[in-house]
């Protein structure tokens, strides 16, 4: 049953990957317990929803990146925190950075696309994050430029997850040593702001936008 016509792409990314892991761990049963079948259907829909002219894909095929939301103008830009190359790599090979790396290996179709999406996302991390602070925006153009819509061109709540996604991709696949450069960069920035008290919202060049100290951001930085 459809609950909402405007899903955020990252939810489906986690659903598909969790189902692939369930299939590998417990095997496949009947109906909704055929985990691999359910995962493959999600992957196919994410990339081919628009094939019949009735919808919008969750991934932009030209740029090989997740859209912010598959509806209207929200499908014309991305969200760096939705980029999960470690998943895409697995999707490309599973027929086995980190989600896309998974999809590149485990999907039954579009494997080359998912492998290319992993590389596109790794490059996007470099393009979207500040070279001095390591901070990235909530929303971004496909070029990596900040998308300042509703103040989401700054480092706010979505952007907390970027560092964790970069770290997870490197932990799983170690495809790009730039990940360690970024980790050192962003952790040094927050350490200098007061490791026990740094604020939770910033401009990309390091101006504090909120004094609130959030355990969620601390957890992402610890990853």
Regions found by a protein language model. Give the residues of each.
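Aromatic-rich carbohydrate-recognition surfaces in CAZymes
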Residues: 2-27
């Amino acid at each position: 049953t459809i609950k909402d016509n405007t899903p955020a792409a990252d939810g489906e990314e986690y659903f598909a990957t969790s189902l692939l892991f369930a299939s590998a761990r417990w095997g496949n049963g009947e109906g909704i317990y055929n985990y691999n079948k359910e995962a493959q259907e999600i992957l196919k829909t994410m990339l081919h929803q628009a094939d019949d002219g009735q919808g919008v894909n969750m991934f932009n095929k030209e740029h090989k990146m997740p859209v912010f939301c598959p509806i209207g103008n929200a499908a014309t830009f991305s969200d760096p925190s939705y980029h999960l190359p470690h998943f895409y790599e697995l999707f490309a090979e599973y027929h086995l950075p980190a989600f896309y790396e998974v999809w590149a290996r485990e999907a039954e179709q579009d494997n080359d696309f998912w492998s290319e999406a992993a590389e596109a996302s790794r490059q996007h991390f470099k393009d979207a994050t500040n070279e001095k602070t390591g901070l990235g925006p909530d929303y971004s153009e496909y070029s990596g430029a900040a998308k300042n819509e509703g103040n989401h061109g700054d480092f706010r709540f979505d952007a907390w997850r970027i560092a964790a996604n970069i770290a997870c991709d490197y932990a799983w696949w170690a495809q790009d040593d730039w990940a360690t450069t970024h980790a050192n960069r962003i952790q040094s920035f927050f350490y200098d702001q007061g490791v026990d008290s740094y604020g939770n919202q910033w401009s990309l060049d390091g101006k504090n936008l909120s004094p609130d100290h959030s355990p969620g951001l601390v957890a992402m930085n610890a990853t």
